[in-house]
């Protein structure tokens, strides 16, 4: 009986299915840019993904504790670097570079004319005025006014004078005949004729 049982057990074992083997999983394809080790080898199309930053060290032999790494050893205390050629300093348009505080800025704006220059009036000049000819005028008795013309200067023109009737008490004690050419430097004097019952007297009044 024991022999029959063993034979039956052997047959069952031989007829039984073989044990299942462990299958290895197939590799899942992943994009090249997402792999952890591709940052330093294969650049991404964007050129900014998974890129390792370069470590830039101090190229100097020694650096003190209190010395900043961005400060050059040849930098001056005023934060100015030395000139590349000390015999011929750098320049812009032929001018030497100086400190901004010592540089005198040039004013290129249009300047007005100085006050000591005589500026002639714009416009057409009459031929008689250009030649200095005094135009004829009516007598004072008929025109009702007295006109005295300055005879000096290229722009000599008749200056009208006001008429003061007889009986006034503001007649000057002495006659002042000082006249100035129009456009000259100094006060412009207008000669006013004062008519009195006895004689004609002139007075110059200065205006600013």
Swiss-Prot record:
Residues 1-16 form the signal peptide. Keywords: Signal. Residues 44-54 have a biased composition (Basic residues). This is Uncharacterized protein Rv2306c. It comes from the Bacteria. Residues 16-25 have a biased composition (Low complexity). Residues 32-43, 55-95 have a biased composition (Basic and acidic residues). Residues 1-95, 145-176 are annotated as: Disordered. GO terms for cellular component: plasma membrane. Residues 148-158, 167-176 have a biased composition (Polar residues).
